[in-house]
Amino acid sequence: MRCVHFGECGSCTLALPYEDQLNFKANFIADKFREFFDGELEIFSSKPQRYRSRAEFGIWHENDEIYYTMHGSRSKFIKISECLKVDESIAALMPRLLEELGTSNELKSKIFGVEFISTSELCAVILLYHKRLEGLEAAFSELAKRLGVKIVARSRGQKISSDERELCDSFEINGLRYALNFGDSAFIQPNKCVNEKMISWAMNAVQNAEDMLEMYCGHGNFTIPLAGKFRRVLATEISKSSIANALKNCERNGIGNIKFLRMSAEELMSAFSGERGFRRLEGVNLADFTFSHVLVDPPRAGLEASVINFIKNYENIVYISCNPQTLYENLKELSLTHKATKFAMFDQFANTNHIECGVVLKKR
């Protein structure tokens, strides 16, 4: 990776040719998890550059000029002129946005950050401010028209959108195309190519399927494509906006066998144990489901002990992890009742130390 900021920017940390990076990560995962899995590790690579469809940068003000910034490796931040990780759409947009903002005192005043999201249909730019935004609606709308993007401006307690277009991305899994709506503040997998590989791997890992229970489902990134493998799916998520988009995604993709519930993991477990009732479960009889599989895609903190004890009851577990250390700790407990039958490494973030994994566990 020939980035002019490598070594100063704290984002990319692996100064190795890409194949060597991949081998380094694969060897690390194989060694770390050898006590749980002694089969063949499946390895899924990324493009070395231009793979991120979502990226965030700080904005630095200096002598009436503004610059993009990133966290520095030896300093709090560094000014950057380019980023080789962002995809082609974002890379082309970055200098144009900076030029537009730099020529407008009202738009550059008190701005401290910017986020880019590119989809197959639309690019969105989220501008972050330390000031009130009243009276700037027209300026944001004109900026959006000049750049050909959707602008979302945010300040504490305020949000202004240049238009009402929704973010939606499409992808192909095993020959089938899907389109998913998501919110501008929702979590998404920023590496589209590797995300497709993750979903395809999970689909191919499912055998002898009946019903699926999914926790931490978001807007349906895994749920929607996997639904075709199961008779019925029950999927839970705590975010109200993500559930709203998940419901839209069912309709958009013509899928009718998923029941989405806005529930935390703790609430779901209480519902299953019968400790309390929930109005959100009206019309849903949990006893009607025959869950052959449970899919979990938790945050970096991994699964809490109560969730581990809960999912131990299921025959098959598909665990998607964004943190090898918490995955390792969770597998210490899950391996008491389940055996890892498939293990995959997904290189979501080339040139960094970040590693994502997928594990299929079957009850002993």
UniProtKB/Swiss-Prot annotation:
Annotated positions binding S-adenosyl-L-methionine: 189, 216, 221, 237, 297
Cellular component terms per the entry's GO annotation: cytosol
Keyword tRNA processing: yes
Matching Gene3D superfamilies: 2.40.50.1070, Vaccinia Virus protein VP39
GO biological processes: methylation; tRNA processing
InterPro entries the record matches: MeTrfase_TrmA_AS, SAM-dependent_MTases_sf, TrmA_MeTrfase, U5_MeTrfase_fam
Active-site residues annotated for this sequence: 322, 356
Keyword tRNA-binding: no
Domain of life: Bacteria
CDD domains cross-referenced by the UniProt entry: AdoMet_MTases
Enzyme nomenclature, EC number: 2.1.1.-, 2.1.1.35
Catalytic activity: uridine(54) in tRNA + S-adenosyl-L-methionine = 5-methyluridine(54) in tRNA + S-adenosyl-L-homocysteine + H(+); uridine(341) in tmRNA + S-adenosyl-L-methionine = 5-methyluridine(341) in tmRNA + S-adenosyl-L-homocysteine + H(+)
Molecular-function annotations in GO: rRNA binding; tRNA (uracil(54)-C5)-methyltransferase activity, S-adenosyl methionine-dependent; tRNA binding
Top EC class for this record: transferase
Keywords assigned: Methyltransferase, S-adenosyl-L-methionine, Transferase, tRNA processing
Xref: NCBIfam families: trmA_only
Similarity annotation: Belongs to the class I-like SAM-binding methyltransferase superfamily. RNA M5U methyltransferase family. TrmA subfamily.
Primary role: Dual-specificity methyltransferase that catalyzes the formation of 5-methyluridine at position 54 (m5U54) in all tRNAs, and that of position 341 (m5U341) in tmRNA (transfer-mRNA).
Protein name per its UniProtKB record: tRNA/tmRNA (uracil-C(5))-methyltransferase
Organism: Campylobacter curvus (strain 525.92)
